Structure formats: structure tokens, C-alpha cells
Amino acid sequence: MRSHPKSGPISEQVIKAIAEVDEATERVSTARRDFLKLFGYGAAGVMLGGLSIDRDGAPRLFSTAAAASPEKSPYAKEFGFSKDLLYMNIGTTGSSPTKVVTDFYADYADIAQSPTAYFFGQQVMRNTIAPGFGCDPYELVMSFNTTDGLWRIVMGVPFQPGDEVITTNMEEDAGISAVSILRDRFGVVVRTVDLPTNDAYSDQEVLDRFAAQLTAGTKAILFSSPIYLTGARLPEKALCQWAAFNNLISIVDGAHLPGMVVLDLHDMGCDFFSGAGHKWQCGPGQTGFLYIRNNFHPEDRIVERPTSDFAPFGVPSEAVSIPIPGYTNTNPLPTYYPTNTLIYGAAGILANGVRNPEHNIAAVLQLVGNGSRPSQRALVETCDMWDAWGRGAIEDYIVSLAQYLRARIAEIWGPQSLSIPYVTPAQPVARTGLTSFNPFSPAFDYNAELSPEASSQQRSASSAAVSTLMSDYSIVIRNNSVPHSLRSDPTQNAAPGSFSSPLRVSTHLFHSLDDVDRLIEALLAVVPYPAW
């Protein structure tokens, strides 16, 4: 046993605690090093702000390591946040780049002067953005938001009484409302998967829990990813492949995916997808993406697509060549009725719910009347910016920064405080910019079991922390009420009266290491800190 010359022998418990602290500090150094590699640091020792960075990129003195990070994200100059505001709630809504905002205003001014000047042009817009999401312009609709897209999906699929839909216990309100209407109006049976949290989580566990809900009556699955409560990115492709293997319709609420990660919808294999344009893609409000799989060709192809909105209905149009990836889902196309369109059945497209892979179904679904062209054009402009910057580079930036945040959290409150297992390098579940953690539960345990009274107290403390961060530190995050796994039995989730109230932080491309450190410093002033 180790000893100290003044204090005598050090207990095994203290030695273990010291080892855990050392391990946590190493995780922070590793996460920082991984992030700095994005800027080319680490090849040879450099000096930043008086701090020496070793050849492997690790800072020698963690206490002053913040000096090693760039003062701002390389993308930050494109955005116009209020001075001193640290906005970290992109999961609720994002912020459009300054140029996009300027062009948005200009478009509205032009429309005021010439009201019909921007009445059409959506086909060109869809041609522009579809490749960035790994799909055909014939399949991608610029919707009003994720909720709008989800409703147009579930109301267009001809569900019958007794059909079953598998969903999860952590859906956003849009998904909950959608399956509830199916239940109450059409007699659909809703079967719910309780999702695991913290060290109870694994992709295989998620797949097993979905499989346990499968019956002969199952018609569809509807799930969100990443989960807005926990930030966990579910195994989207594996779930869609499982659904296809069992001849089920797959519906994905991907509200947070556009703009956060590389999104290849053909590779994901979903039948339907709805995502937000105003969150991580940083478009204006009331914008989103609706995808409806309309083919099953497994090979990558070059397709010719028109530039006129009315080409599908016989109007002559110039065409452009667009590369699209092959489909991993080669199942027959499910029956689908367009529930919101001016031109149902035009040119035979989607008449009686019949599908034809050669049809431009997006043209029918897009024509719903006079939408906001400035909003649509602004959304396309943000997509152009993301494509130019590189969606892969953006995902790597976001994930690396989120991993650094998780390392700081694990260093202080322990890895048990996080919603998902903390592993480096980031596993698929962690390839997201959403981080959920709970510094309020007993032992800072995300899966701690709470009485209704303790749950209520935690909710008050969590809400107070969010409020104080905003009022005293100009930092915006949010909290949630989460049905977490139980520590005593991870196969069971907390009852509604005993939900926990963790904090949720969004790290995006305009944030930096300094921003994360600023958040951590503020958190230490307003939430519990371990007594080492």
C-alpha cells in the first residue's frame, strides 16, 4: 500500500480515486488532442498563448490548456450571435449565417416589389440539395418542418385497424402525436420500445428490444435519431435493414441529422424520413426535409433531372445530370397517398397510392400553394455552404468537440453521469452534437433510481441551473425529463413520476474548445461538484 510521509498509509479507496482522476484527465487530454488535430496541430510542438503543446498534441499543463484552443471556430465568423452570448441549444433551433440572413431580407424585398417573381423554382432547389443528403431530387421535398413531414408520412400510409407500429419511449412530441392519432383514429396498435441509457446502452440492445416487439401484425417502425432527450444516435441503418428484412415500413424522425452529420438516405435504407431545416442545418424557421424512397436500384447512377417545376406534367424543360447513390433497401415501394398537394393524381403520379420509380413524386408533394420562397432559398443557401465546407469535415468537427465536452464532464462528474457510454474514439452512438448528462442525481448517476419526490427536486434544480446559466453567464442550454434505465435493473426504465432531469448541450460548428471550457466553468458554479 502506498503511503505519504506525513499522513501515513493511503487507503485502497483513495488510490482507486486517484487512478480514476488520472484516467479522467487522460481522457480530457486525448479529446483535446483529437480536436486540435482538425487544425493541423500536433505534428510538431507549437506554442500557443504561452502553453507548450507536445509533439503528440497533448497540452503539458491541463490547468491552462484552454490557451491551446483556437479563440474561435473557423466557422464562427459566418454567424452573427449577440456579443457575449454562448448559444448551445441548437437542438431546439439553430442560427442562420449572416449572409443567409442578408439574402433572406433581400428576397422578401424583391417579392414585395414583384410578387410573382419567385413563385416557382423548387425543382432547381431540390436538384441542388438532394445530392447532399444522398437521395434523388424526385424523392426530396422541402417541407415546413419535421412535424409537417411526419404527418404527411403517417397520414399517407394506408394503416388499417389492428396494424401495429413499433416506436420508442423517447420520441419528440411530433412522433408521439402521430402514432397517437393512428391509434385513436384508425385503431392502430402502438408498441413501445424502452430505450437504454448510460452503460445499459448498446446498438445490439436497441435492436434486441425492437425485435422483442415484433408480431405478425407489425406494419411499421417509427423512431427518432439522434434521440432528442439523450443525444444517443440509434443504429439507423441497422434498424431500417431489420425492418426491410421483416417487410416493415421504416419511418425515421431525423430532426437533428441534417446539418449535423453526413446524411446518405439511400444508404440508411429508410422508406420515409423527416428532418428539420432550422436546427443543425441553420436554415430559417418553418423549413424542413421530407424524403420518400421511390426506387430500389442497388447501384450508383447518373440521372437526368428537369429544371422546371412542371416538367413531370408535360411542360418542356432543360435537364441536368445528377449522381445518386444506390439503395440498400430494395424492397417493393409501400403504398402512399399524398395528403397535402394541389395536384393529386396529376400525370398519374401517386394516383390511388400507386408508386412508379420513374415518377417525380416530390413535384406533386411540393406543390401545396404559395409557400415562403425566401425561406426555401435561404435553406438552399445554407445547404450550399455546408456542401462547400464539406459535410464530413463538419461532422468530424462537431463530434470531436462533443467528445471533448464529454471528457470534461466525465472528468468532473464521472462517466456514469453521461446518457451514453463514454468511449474513445467516438462510437456510432456518440457521433452527434447532442450531449446529455446528469450532475443532479445521486452519485451523479444518469441511471440512478429516484422517488417521485427526488424526481421533483431534481427537476427544480435542473431548471434553476438552466435559468442561472442564462441570466448570470449568458449561456443557453436546456434540460429534459428523461425515462432513464434503472441501475438495479437496466432492462427497466423509470416510471413517469420518477423521470430524471439531465442537462442537454448542443455543440455545433461555430463553437470552440474555449466555448466548452467557458460552459464547464459556469456549470461548476451552479451545479453540484464532487467532494474529492
Language-model features: where?
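N-terminal secretory signal peptides
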Residues: M1-A31
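C-terminal segment of N-terminal export signals and the immediately downstream linker at the start
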Residues: D22-T25, G50-T92, D103-I111, P306-F310, ...
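Conserved N-terminal alpha-helix of the aminotransferase class I/II PLP-enzyme fold
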Residues: D110-D148, I398, Q403
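Conserved PLP-anchoring active-site segment centered on the Schiff-base-forming lysine
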Residues: Y138-E139, V154-S180, V189
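Active-site phosphate-binding strand-loop segment of PLP-dependent enzymes
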Residues: Y201-A255, G259, W280
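Active-site C-terminal subdomain of aminotransferase-like
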Residues: C282-P284, I292-Y397
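Conserved PLP-binding catalytic core of the aspartate aminotransferase-like
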Residues: R391, V399-R406, A410-Y473, N480-V482, ...
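PLP-dependent enzyme catalytic core of the Aspartate aminotransferase-like
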Residues: L450-S451, D472, S481-W532
